[in-house]
């Protein structure tokens, strides 16, 4: 067996197998320290090497492993003794395997085959294990290094040569009899000397320098390190095989101490995770250090600057940032914050006030801080923050550094800094922090201003300083590094959450960072929509005009107002404009952007919820995920109290207009760093101009501080999921409180829907979205789904059953086509006219009832409905055409039902667009599963609230997509207040993206105008035949759109979903959380329906969602924008459900978007 030959695929396979076997043996040992693992692996590798060198490597391996242990025992006696024990335990465990391996000792390849067949039968692909083991060996090689031992082994091997391999086998057999570690070590020393002498020359032949270096470096590191090196070599494969065989034999041997194997298994587990975590740890360690440095500096500088720099925020803080380099960054950050605060006042007076000071602080402080703060602050702040955030530091540090660097680079120079952002988090961190603080302090000051203008700032700033000291780290990165903000806030505010929620969130955010990259706008919309939800959500709906105007000039503000549908519309274009470039600039920027919106959203959410229920927010913060759901419910209730009546919210809209601007301004500021300081200044000025009205009518400064703190904590605890939940739950109680309003609004919305129908793009697109969702499951079933939806009004339980029935999106299409289709057909046949009447009635009076009762079934029914034959759906649609409510109700039940269903459908579309296309749905789902596996921490974080929904949605992808359809519709419904304007912006903007459903308005021209509808000509004909049920026609169009939308609508719907999350700001997360939980799906449905009710313009919402859907193609054209939306969708509840239930789109589409985004970056 020539080692050179083994260097090829065989060597690689062998190394993989050996790695797997080593890991298997280690785990079989049921224990062992990391040292033990390395001992095992090192022993295995060394033994394998010896085995390669000597035909009978098992004895040699066994003795070699112990020999290494014995020789290393000379160097590190305990380690080698443990290694010997570990090898013995491996003998005990794998005596039979070792015998089998020893049978194939002569033929290393045969032996390798035996190992593969026997020990590695289940792991032919040991690449992962081998990589992990290699990383483990590498990580522990330094620990195990015994240069003298390795040299001795090599010398002995060279001296004795290969002849002792068989003797070593005998000796190893004798060692089995020895049973004593000492005798084993002695005999193994002799054997290993002989083996090493034998394998030494062979190893030098193959890789004399490599093996010698490995052995010289450390006998067992040589075993582990050279094993690692040899892992890529045939020698390592054979030696490792022998070592594995010896491990098996030794585990079977009597004198085995399980502890080493336990340590090895533990190390294997730790290092396997460590292999992944080390990347994060190494990357995030620097990032965390930088982030913590900046955060500590910020906290310190915030305290100083808030006290000292409040009066001289713009100039003195600039000078402070310039003068104090180490403090300069902290100061620059708080100075930027204070400057932002002052500039908030100045922004009210002169928008440019913020821009000049903020850019100055950003650029100048970036240079100074990067030069000085980095070094000094990196040490002290890093140590301090690392100490404070020891557990979450690797993950949180990564996110925080990422955010800090992203923000730093994004604020001074969105593109350049973004470019520097990833490569130099430490360097960018300080600058990022300063520019970051520029925007975020503005945010904080904006919130303060909203609550208290300049007069209150000192108190609010002091309180805010205290709160920021607790929450500033996340808040400062909150602008661009909201994700890290959440993490940082979690780590700082919630140490226990740091370990659990922070790590999960960091893992969750790590993958969601990409998702959020595409979803910061949605997050912003979520945040804006959520935080104003008490007073601003309606306001945002009303302020869409203001926000719409502001977003144009200030994309961040626009993104902020994006929470509301109207802003969303403009935001799509603007987000594409400015979010896309920052995202294109760098993924960290996108992550930061996503983080910032989510952070703001969380902050606004926390503020909103804290205004209503500060204690619940605190509880949610403490209770992390579980509390997140309950807290979100509490927050939803609080939001209900504040924004319970959707109609009330509308009247409040104008009053809240300032408030929405305030959250928008905050969001804008947070996002503005992504754009630029100028944009930030403009947004700030706009936000400030809008915010002064908001803060005074809003909460007092201290209250806002508390709310901000709690919001930050909530954000950290719940992440965006809790945001969605909070808003969604808020909206759910709000809908409950204002069901009559919703019913009235439903009538109004029906009118609005008709209006939007006049806009072919929106309703048509929304319906197309819904239909493509269903169409993805099955175009024909979706056509039947319209009747199914129609029936869902009549047969709500059936829809529930349908929803639960579809286990998987694919199964959904088939199973629904079969059983569900039959049930729906039966229901359709039995309830065609009744459903129309019932739908109409539900839309009128039963609307609330339908909302509450049928809401979930409808939503589920919508899930099921796609299974319905398109013909049946066409039939139902045609039947419903006569009745406007009935028409939409076929798809949605009554219009109110329709709203519910829309909301649910928005949910479904929201989720389903991700799993929108059947083919891409599977792919996306597979991607979602991959990302799910990849995002274990995220899933762990989301598992409680979201996994429940995700698993049903994953299993019931079509129901999920239907939910998403509902969700998407609901998000559209949600921003109903501003949905028409949003639709105007949205579908006009997305029209270029997807002309088919561009104007998928409730106007039947939209139905006629169905570039996507051609996939369902008959369905389109059905739609055309019933132009009155614009929603239904829209849905039919989505079905027709489905085939096209799978191509375009997939992205389109992804964006649409993203928009839906924006529309349903936090509702998507709530959907995500609720849909993740099977029991929550009803709540989700209710909340979705309530969202629809809350924003009765369900048709509008559909239109808006459709427009967003339409925008998706445009977003595809604008990859970064789409990426924004796509990650945002993933990030939002829909993001959560989407990476899981609609991962296909979120990840398939999002993957494309992320790929595009990365490419753009």
UniProtKB/Swiss-Prot annotation:
Disruption phenotype: Mice are viable and morphologically normal, but smaller than wild-type and heterozygous littermates. Homozygous NRIP1-null mature female are defective in ovulation and completely infertile. Embryos with heterozygous NRIP1 loss show anomalies of the urinary tract including dysplastic kidneys with cystic dilations, severe hydoureter with hydronephrosis and ureterocele. A motif (LXXLL motif 3) lies at residues 185-189. The modification Phosphothreonine is found at residue 207. Residues 78-335 are annotated as: Repression domain 1. The modification N6-acetyllysine is found at residues 111, 158, 287, 311, 447, 482, 529, 607, 932. A motif (LXXLL motif 8) lies at residues 820-824. A motif (LXXLL motif 5) lies at residues 382-386. Residues 1-416, 754-1161 are annotated as: Interaction with ZNF366. Keywords: Acetylation, Activator, Biological rhythms, Isopeptide bond, Nucleus, Phosphoprotein, Receptor, Repeat, Repressor, Transcription, Transcription regulation, Ubl conjugation. The keyword DNA damage does not apply. Transmembrane segments: none annotated. A motif (LXXLL motif 9) lies at residues 937-941. A motif (LXXLL motif 6) lies at residues 501-505. Residues 724-747, 950-962 have a biased composition (Basic and acidic residues). It is found in: Nucleus. Contains at least 4 autonomous repression domains (RD1-4). Contains 9 Leu-Xaa-Xaa-Leu-Leu (LXXLL) motifs, which have different affinities for nuclear receptors. PANTHER family: NUCLEAR FACTOR RIP140, NUCLEAR RECEPTOR-INTERACTING PROTEIN 1. This is Nuclear receptor-interacting protein 1. The lineage of its organism: Eukaryota, Metazoa, Chordata, Craniata, Vertebrata.
């Amino acid at each position: 067996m020539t080692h050179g030959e083994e260097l090829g695929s065989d060597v690689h396979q062998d190394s993989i197998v050996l790695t797997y076997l080593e890991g298997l043996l280690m785990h079989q040992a049921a224990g062992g320290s990391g040292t033990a693992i390395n001992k095992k692996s090192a022993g295995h590798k060394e033994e394998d090497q010896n085995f390669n060198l000597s035909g009978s490597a098992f004895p040699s391996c066994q003795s070699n492993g112990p020999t290494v242990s014995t020789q290393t025992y000379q160097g590190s006696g305990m380690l080698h003794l443990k290694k010997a024990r570990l090898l013995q335990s491996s003998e005990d465990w794998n005596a039979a395997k070792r015998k089998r391996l020893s049978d194939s000792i002569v033929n290393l390849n045969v032996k390798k085959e035996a190992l593969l067949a026997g020990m590695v039968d289940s792991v032919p692909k040991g690449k992962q294990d081998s990589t992990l083991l290699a990383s483990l060996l590498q990580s522990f090689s330094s620990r195990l290094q015994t240069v003298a031992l390795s040299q001795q082994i090599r010398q002995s091997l060279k001296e004795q040569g290969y002849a002792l391999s068989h003797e070593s086998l005998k000796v190893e057999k004798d060692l089995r009899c020895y049973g004593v570690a000492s005798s084993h070590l002695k005999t193994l020393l002799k054997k290993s000397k002989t083996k090493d002498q034998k394998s030494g020359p062979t190893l030098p032949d193959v890789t004399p320098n490599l093996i010698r270096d490995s052995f010289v470096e450390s006998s067992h590191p040589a075993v582990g390190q050279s094993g690692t090196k040899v892992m890529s070599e045939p020698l390592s494969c054979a030696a490792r095989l022998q070592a594995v065989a010896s491990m098996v034999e030794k585990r079977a041997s009597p004198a085995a101490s399980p502890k080493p194997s336990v340590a090895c298994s533990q190390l294997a587990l730790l290092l396997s995770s460590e292999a992944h975590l080390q990347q994060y740890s190494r990357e995030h360690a620097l990032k965390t250090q930088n982030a913590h440095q900046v955060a500590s500096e910020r906290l310190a500088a915030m305290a100083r600057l808030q006290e000292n720099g409040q009066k001289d925020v713009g100039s003195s803080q600039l000078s402070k940032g310039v003068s104090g380099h180490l403090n300069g960054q902290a100061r620059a950050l708080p100075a930027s914050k204070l400057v932002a605060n002052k500039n908030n006042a100045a922004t009210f007076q002169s928008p440019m006030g913020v821009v000049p000071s903020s850019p100055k602080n950003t650029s100048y402080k970036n240079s100074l801080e990067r030069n000085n703060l980095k070094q000094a602050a990196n040490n002290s702040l890093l140590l301090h923050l690392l100490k404070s955030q020891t557990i979450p530091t690797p993950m949180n540090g990564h996110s925080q550094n990422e955010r800090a660097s992203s923000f730093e680079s994004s604020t001074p120079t969105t593109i350049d800094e973004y470019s520097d952002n990833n490569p130099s988090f430490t360097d960018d961190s300080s600058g990022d922090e300063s520019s970051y603080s520029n925007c975020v302090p503005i945010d904080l000051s904006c919130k303060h201003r909203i609550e208290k203008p300049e007069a209150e700032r000192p108190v609010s700033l002091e309180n805010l300083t205290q709160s920021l000291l607790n929450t500033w780290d996340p808040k400062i990165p909150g602008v661009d590094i909201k994700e890290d903000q959440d993490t940082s806030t979690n780590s700082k505010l919630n140490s226990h959450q740091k370990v659990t929620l922070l790590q999960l969130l960091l893992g969750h955010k790590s993958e969601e960072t990409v998702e959020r990259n595409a979803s910061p706008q949605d997050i912003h919309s979520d945040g804006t929509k959520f935080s104003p939800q008490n007073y601003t959500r309606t306001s945002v709906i009303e302020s869409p005009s203001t926000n719409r105007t502001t977003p144009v000039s200030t994309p961040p503000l626009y993104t902020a107002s994006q929470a509301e549908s109207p802003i969303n519309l403009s935001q799509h274009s603007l987000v594409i404009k400015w979010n896309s470039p920052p995202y294109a600039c760098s993924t960290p920027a996108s992550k930061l952007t996503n983080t910032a919106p989510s952070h703001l959203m969380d902050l606004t959410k926390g503020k909103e919820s804290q205004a209503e229920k500060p204690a619940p927010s605190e509880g949610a913060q403490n209770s992390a995920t579980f509390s997140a759901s309950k807290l979100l419910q509490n927050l939803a209730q609080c939001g209900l109290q504040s924004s319970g009546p959707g109609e009330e919210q509308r009247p409040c809209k104008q009053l809240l207009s300032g408030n929405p601007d305030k959250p928008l301004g905050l969001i804008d500021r947070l996002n503005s760093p992504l754009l630029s300081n100028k944009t930030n200044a403009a947004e700030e000025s706009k936000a400030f101009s809008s915010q002064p009205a908001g803060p005074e009518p809003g909460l007092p400064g201290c209250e806002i501080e508390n709310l901000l703190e709690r919001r930050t904590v909530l954000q950290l605890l719940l992440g965006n999921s809790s945001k969605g939940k909070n808003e969604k739950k808020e909206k759910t109680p709000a809908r409950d409180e204002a069901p009559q309003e919703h019913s009235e609004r439903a009538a109004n919305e029906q009118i609005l829907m008709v209006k939007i129908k006049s806009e072919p793009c929106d309703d048509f697109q929304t319906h197309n979205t819904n239909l493509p969702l269903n169409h993805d499951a099955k175009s024909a079933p979706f056509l039947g789904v319209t009747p199914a939806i129609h029936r869902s009004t009549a047969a709500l339980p059936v829809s529930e059953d349908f929803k639960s029935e579809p286990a998987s999106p694919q199964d959904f299409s088939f199973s629904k086509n079969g059983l569900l289709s039959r049930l729906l057909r039966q229901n359709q046949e039995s309830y065609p006219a009744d459903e129309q009447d019932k739908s109409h009635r539900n839309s009128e009076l039963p609307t609330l009832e339908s909302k509450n009762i049928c809401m979930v079934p409808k939503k589920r029914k919508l899930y099921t409905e796609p299974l319905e034959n398109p013909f049946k759906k066409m039939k139902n649609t045609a039947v419903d055409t006569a009745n406007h409510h009935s028409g939409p109700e076929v798809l949605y039940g009554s219009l109110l039902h329709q709203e519910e269903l829309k909301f649910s459908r928005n949910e479904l579309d929201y989720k389903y667009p991700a799993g929108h296309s059947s083919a891409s749905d599977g792919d996306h789902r597979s991607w979602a599963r991959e990302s799910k596996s990849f995002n274990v921490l995220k899933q762990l974080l989301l598992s409680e609230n979201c996994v429940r929904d995700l698993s049903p949605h994953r299993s019931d992808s079509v129901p999920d997509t239907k939910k998403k359809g509902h969700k998407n519709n609901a998000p559209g419904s949600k921003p109903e207040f501003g949905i028409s304007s949003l639709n105007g912006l949205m579908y006009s903007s997305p029209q270029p993206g997807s002309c088919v459903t561009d104007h998928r308005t409730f106007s039947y021209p939209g139905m006629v105008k169905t570039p996507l509808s051609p996939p369902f000509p008959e369905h389109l004909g059905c739609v055309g035949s019933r132009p009155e049920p614009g929603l239904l026609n829209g849905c039919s169009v989505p079905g027709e759109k489905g085939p096209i939308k799978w191509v375009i609508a997939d992205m389109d719907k992804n964006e649409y979903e993203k928009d839906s999350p924006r529309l349903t700001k936090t509702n998507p997360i709530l959907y995500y959380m609720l849909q993740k939980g099977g029991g929550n799906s009803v709540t989700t449905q209710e909340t979705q329906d309530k969202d629809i009710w809350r924003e009765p313009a369900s048709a509008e919402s559909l239109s808006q969602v459709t427009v967003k859907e339409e925008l998706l193609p445009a977003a595809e054209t604008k990859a970064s924008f789409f990426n924004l939306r796509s990650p945002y969708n993933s990030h939002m509840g829909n993001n959560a459900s989407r990476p899981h239930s609609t991962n296909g789109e979120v990840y398939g589409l999002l993957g494309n978007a992320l790929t595009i985004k990365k490419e753009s970056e």
